[in-house]
């Protein structure tokens, strides 16, 4: 069976299974977290002297779902200080749950970014990125190590007993921000003040066809129009469109829409056209700060 035919067969099979289970939706039992209610006040991070001190020990938990499966998985984003001052580890980890976990062989994804602050302490720079994927008994690790002094990036891919290593040049003056690094830099104002209608083009680790992360903050008019039917309408202030490498979120175009509070806490988002599942919706259910 060739790859294309296999892809279609798996998709058709998954659609049939989901349709067959539609009548059981009311009886599905998934583990739940206490949600951050729309009526609650979402505290802003206390802006401190440096970007690291501002977000250190912040943890966000999201629940994600689609169609009749409102809780198909969980994801957590966290930032912790490391052994050396000015060095941090940012992590995003996600796991499918329940029947979707069974159908996806309990897929687990973990992205770890080792970050250092720049001299002004107003920007994170990723010096090592680890992408770890487990699907059933399959385990793949991809490691990117950035050496900005010598302008080179070492890429290691480990799958089972097989390992490959490639060294690629980093163009002069370029700093690669992976999506996790960009998440904190954007919220801190590293790319400039967040304004309605503003767009950002951010250099990122080159993917198959992507060399940049694109961010766009919707206009005030568009934001007000689109949030009319949101239960969290009074808590969100910005609608942000994000485009990253499609292979990272396994979608057609790598497009994400996110709703942020005035202090840039993400409350709700949609990953568009995820393969097999369509639009996957996520909401913040737990927030902690150190």
List PLM regions with ranges.
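Residue-level marker of intrinsically disordered, low-complexity segments enriched
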Residues: 34, 156, 165, 242, ...
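Acidic, serine/threonine-rich low-complexity disordered tracts
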Residues: 39-148, 192-290
């Amino acid at each position: 069976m060739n790859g294309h035919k296999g892809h279609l067969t798996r998709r058709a099979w998954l659609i049939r299974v989901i349709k067959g289970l539609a009548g059981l939706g009311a009886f599905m039992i998934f583990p739940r977290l206490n949600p951050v209610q729309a009526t609650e006040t979402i505290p802003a991070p206390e802006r401190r002297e440096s970007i690291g001190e501002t977000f250190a020990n912040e943890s966000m938990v999201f629940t994600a779902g689609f169609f009749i499966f409102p809780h198909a998985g969980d994801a957590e984003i966290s930032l912790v200080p490391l052994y050396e001052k000015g060095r941090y580890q940012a992590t995003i980890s996600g796991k499918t749950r329940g029947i979707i976990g069974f159908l996806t062989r309990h897929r687990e994804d973990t992205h770890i970014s080792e970050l250092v602050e720049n001299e002004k302490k107003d920007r994170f720079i990723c010096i090592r990125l680890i992408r770890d994927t487990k699907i059933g008994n399959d385990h793949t690790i991809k490691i990117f190590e950035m050496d900005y002094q010598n302008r080179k990036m070492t890429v290691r891919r480990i799958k089972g007993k097989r390992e490959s290593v490639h060294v690629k040049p980093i163009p002069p003056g370029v700093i690669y921000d992976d999506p996790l690094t960009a998440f904190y830099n954007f919220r801190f104002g590293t790319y400039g003040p967040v304004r309605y209608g503003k767009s950002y083009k951010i250099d990122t680790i080159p993917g198959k066809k992507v060399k940049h992360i694109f961010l766009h903050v919707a206009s005030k008019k568009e934001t007000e129009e689109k949030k009319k039917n949101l239960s969290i309408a009074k808590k969100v202030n910005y609608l942000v469109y994000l485009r990253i490498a499609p292979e990272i979120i396994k979608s057609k175009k790598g497009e994400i829409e996110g709703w942020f509070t005035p202090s840039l806490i993400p409350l709700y988002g949609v990953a568009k056209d995820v393969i097999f599942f369509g639009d996957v919706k996520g909401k913040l259910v737990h927030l902690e700060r150190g």
